[in-house]
């Protein structure tokens, strides 16, 4: 069972979401906890799966992957074997950076980051040759207006805010 997050956990998570490279000394100063207490809390949050990973976020434009494609997929097949095959192909494709099963008219949504339309087309051909799909529609992003990896966290009490 996962423990309930307290105000200090929330403050630490908020700080790390904004800067995962923050030192224990910086976290200590901003939370009012000792560096050792911050370290222990982070280890517990990692063990509980609250903190999944610490990564460096890259700018897709600056590494030559400036085209964002949302691929809407409809299918008639929904068996576990079919899904396992589909998942295998998606997992083999690093261009697919997000993958969702949906409720509604569209069954699956993929988000791709590619260098060119021809790169998207190569992935499209690979996908439709290996998985039975009813309809595949691509939506090409013209401009990213907002992108965030920061999740909204519950408000902390006044006590934690005064200490931070």
Swiss-Prot record:
InterPro entries, alphabetized = ArsR-like_HTH, AsnC-type_HTH_dom, Dimeric_a/b-barrel, Tscrpt_reg_AsnC-like, Tscrpt_reg_AsnC/Lrp_C, Tscrpt_reg_HTH_AsnC-type_CS, WH-like_DNA-bd_sf, WH_DNA-bd_sf
Single biological process term from Gene Ontology: response to amino acid
Residues of the DNA-binding region: 24-43
Q: Which GO terms describe its molecular function?
A: sequence-specific DNA binding
Keyword vocabulary terms for this entry:
DNA-binding, Repressor, Transcription, Transcription regulation
Residue span(s) of domain HTH asnC-type: 5-66
| Gene3D superfamilies, per the entry | 3.30.70.920, Winged helix-like DNA-binding domain superfamily/Winged helix DNA-binding domain (1.10.10.10)
Pfam families assigned: AsnC_trans_reg (PF01037), HTH_24 (PF13412)
SUPFAM superfamilies associated with the record? Dimeric alpha+beta barrel, Winged helix' DNA-binding domain
Domain of life, per UniProt, equals: Bacteria
The answer, when asked if Transcription is one of the entry's keywords, is yes
Q: Which GO terms describe its cellular component?
A: cytosol
Give TM regions: none
The protein's matches in CDD domains, at most eight in alphabetical order, are given as: HTH_ARSR
Role, per record: Represses the secondary, H(+)-coupled glutamate uptake system (Gluemp) genes.
* Designated name of the protein: Glutamate uptake regulatory protein
Q: Give the source species.
A: Zymomonas mobilis subsp. mobilis (strain ATCC 31821 / ZM4 / CP4)
Q: In the record, what lineage is assigned to the organism producing the protein?
A: Bacteria, Pseudomonadati, Pseudomonadota, Alphaproteobacteria, Sphingomonadales
């Amino acid at each position: 069972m996962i423990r309930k997050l307290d105000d200090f956990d929330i403050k630490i998570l908020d700080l790390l979401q904004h800067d995962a490279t923050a030192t224990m000394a910086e976290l200590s100063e901003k939370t009012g906890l000792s560096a050792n207490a911050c370290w222990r809390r982070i280890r517990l949050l990692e063990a509980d799966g609250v903190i999944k990973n610490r990564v460096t976020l890259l700018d897709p434009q600056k590494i030559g992957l400036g085209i964002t494609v949302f691929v809407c997929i409809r299918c008639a097949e929904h068996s576990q074997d079919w899904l396992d095959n589909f998942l295998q192909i998606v997992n083999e494709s690093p261009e697919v950076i997000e993958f969702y099963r949906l409720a509604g008219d569209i069954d699956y949504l993929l988000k791709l980051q590619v260098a060119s339309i021809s790169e998207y087309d190569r992935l499209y051909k690979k996908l439709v040759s290996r998985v039975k799909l009813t309809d595949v529609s691509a939506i090409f992003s013209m401009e990213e207006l907002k992108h965030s990896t920061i999740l909204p966290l519950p408000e902390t009490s006044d006590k934690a805010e005064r200490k931070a």
